[in-house]
């Protein structure tokens, strides 16, 4: 009960420092990123003599600029340096606007460190590695983490997944000081995420998630799902949360999200990296899934909020983007503006805004994922726009508690999470679903039934399979596939053998494979489709559907296969 009170209150509401040689003072003009927006200027604050392969940035309550140096992200055999990531305090000791000294704030068993953030009230420094959130303190303000107050495993991701930048990242804090963070798709590997007081949640293959916990990591809860990799997460005053989604696969653009509690943003790794499977939605195409707020440049990393606008670092497109937010009653609209565009080696990763109005931006420099010995921190001025008003916290109430009697809850996808929760238990009655004449409303009632009873003890998913609307049939198949509902196998196999449409054939053969414990990522499911197409006893309808949804025919069908199809005389084929 205590954790729920904390959570819904949110919804409503040591190493030795060493000096280094001074950094070079000159920066070749042709290598500097170019300001695009009026009034913006940028200069290099620190170069690779002070920072290499930087990821996260943060400014402490005392004004110290902390920067993460990665020494572990695809480390080559000949890389020189310590075998742990390092957090440096970067200083401008002579006040000329260019950093000239660094010292070690913390370095001890840091692997694939992605982010660093300062708690708004306590001043504690939170660090996100791929698998762990650590809390550090500097109570005596000496620029070195207090060795007796290092809190490891505030949150821990227990998994065999080890790709460096699709685990924990995106640290931020809500208005009450609670912790919010992202976890990437983890390449679909099984995981258990462990919070304070031994809270454990396990899953696999569902894609990236955004999580909420109290400041000490306790009361861990999933806040939203359906991301690829919410690498950057930011909280704006009033309880509004935004995130970057780092990778669009074959469905560009990358996504910028307004993150709503309980929202499903459509992606699931188990159905393939391409993002083309009918069970995947990228922009709210399926009922119950959330549309993106806007597209971003490729490989968006950190996100920062200031004065009613969002700032995004696009690593691959080498630019800093700004998005002014306009409230429309149930969410936001926005347009993209380019502030800074890089030429050549400019790969922005993370931001930190200082009290003097400067924006610091870490720069990985090269496109290489392997460590390469280069790095920079840039200082941007003139970047903050005039204040754009944000709505009060009360404006989010319709996003949390629905009124099903209002039509807007049935038509605006951003209100779907609240509606699905509100319908809840009532829609476990199959009669209520059948009685709904509007197909879209019927689909949302089906999703409410799933939310109330995921294991489908009432057998409602098979009622969805028998519906006349293809979207409802698709949602029923997805429910069965996601949860691997064995009791629905016969009904799913019947649809495979008599598919209403090619799209539903693909969905049904995927669900059948999932029930049988098979993997269904892109090439695996394509192989199953090819096998059905070659079956001589398969009906014309099945073979025609299989042929239409077989994406890589040249890889799955030989010349002999095509000749047999042609010589069969089957007019449907």
Where in this protein do the model-derived segments appear?
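Bacterial N-terminal signal peptides
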Residues: 5-15
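Solvent-exposed, polar/charged alpha-helical surfaces in well-ordered, non-transmembrane soluble domains
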Residues: 43, 88, 103, 208-211, ...
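Gly/Ser/Thr/Pro-enriched helix-cap/hinge segments flanking short amphipathic alpha-helices
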Residues: 354, 358, 408-413, 417
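Alpha-solenoid HEAT/Armadillo-like helical repeat scaffolds in large eukaryotic proteins
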Residues: 406-411, 431-437, 448, 460-468, ...
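Core helices of alpha-solenoid repeat scaffolds
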Residues: 457-458, 489, 522-526, 559
């Amino acid at each position: 009960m205590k954790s729920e009170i904390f959570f819904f209150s949110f919804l409503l509401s040591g190493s030795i420092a060493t000096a280094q040689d001074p950094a070079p003072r000159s920066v070749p003009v042709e290598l500097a990123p170019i300001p695009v927006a009026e009034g913006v200027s940028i200069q290099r604050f620190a170069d690779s003599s002070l920072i290499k392969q930087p990821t996260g940035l943060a400014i402490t309550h005392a004004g110290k600029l902390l920067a993460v140096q990665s020494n572990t992200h695809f480390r080559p055999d000949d890389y020189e340096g310590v075998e742990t990531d390092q957090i440096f305090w970067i200083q401008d000791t002579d006040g000329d606007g260019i950093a000239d000294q660094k010292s070690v704030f913390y370095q001890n068993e840091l692997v694939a460190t992605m982010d660093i953030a300062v708690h708004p009230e306590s001043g504690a420094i939170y660090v996100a590695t791929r698998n762990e959130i650590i809390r550090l303190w500097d109570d005596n303000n000496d620029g070195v983490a207090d060795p007796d107050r290092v809190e490891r495993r505030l949150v821990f991701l227990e998994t065999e997944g080890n790709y460096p930048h699709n685990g924990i990242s995106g640290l931020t804090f809500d208005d009450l000081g609670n912790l919010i963070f992202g976890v990437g798709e983890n390449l679909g590997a099984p995981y258990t995420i462990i919070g304070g007081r031994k809270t454990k949640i396990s899953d696999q293959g569902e894609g990236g998630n955004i999580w909420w916990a109290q400041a000490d990591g306790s009361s861990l809860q999933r806040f939203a799902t359906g991301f690829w990799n919410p690498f950057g997460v930011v909280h704006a005053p009033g309880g509004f949360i935004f995130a970057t989604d780092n990778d669009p696969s074959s469905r560009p653009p990358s996504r910028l999200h307004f993150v709503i509690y309980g929202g499903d943003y459509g992606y699931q790794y188990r159905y393939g990296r391409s993002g083309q499977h009918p069970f995947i939605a990228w922009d709210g195409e399926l009922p119950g899934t959330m549309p993106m707020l806007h597209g971003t440049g490729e490989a968006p990393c950190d996100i920062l909020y200031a004065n009613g606008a969002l700032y995004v670092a696009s690593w691959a497109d080498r630019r800093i983007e700004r998005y002014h937010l306009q409230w429309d009653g149930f969410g936001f609209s926005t347009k993209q503006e380019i502030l800074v565009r890089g030429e050549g080696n400019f790969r922005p990763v993370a931001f930190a805004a200082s009290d003097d109005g400067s924006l610091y931006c870490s720069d990985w420099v090269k496109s290489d994922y392997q460590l390469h010995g280069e790095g920079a921190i840039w200082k941007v001025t003139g970047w903050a726009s005039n204040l754009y008003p944000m709505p009060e916290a009360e404006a989010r109430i319709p996003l949390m508690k629905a009124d099903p009697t209002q039509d807007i809850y049935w038509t605006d996808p951003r209100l779907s999470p609240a509606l699905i929760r509100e319908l809840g238990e009532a829609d476990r009655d199959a009669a209520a679903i059948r009685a709904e004449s509007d197909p879209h409303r019927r689909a949302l009632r089906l999703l409410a039934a799933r939310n109330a009873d995921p294991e489908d003890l009432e057998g409602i998913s098979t009622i969805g399979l028998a519906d006349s609307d293809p979207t409802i049939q698709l949602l029923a198949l997805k429910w069965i596939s996601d949860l691997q509902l064995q009791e629905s196998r016969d009904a799913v196999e019947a649809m495979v053998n008599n598919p209403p449409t090619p799209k539903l054939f693909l969905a049904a053969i995927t669900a059948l494979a999932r029930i049988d414990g098979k993997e269904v990522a892109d090439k695996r499911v394509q192989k199953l489709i090819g096998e059905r197409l070659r079956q001589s006893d398969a009906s014309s309808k099945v073979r025609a559907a299989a042929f239409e949804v077989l994406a890589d025919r040249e890889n799955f069908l030989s010349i002999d296969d095509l000749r047999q199809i042609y010589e069969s005389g089957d007019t449907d084929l």
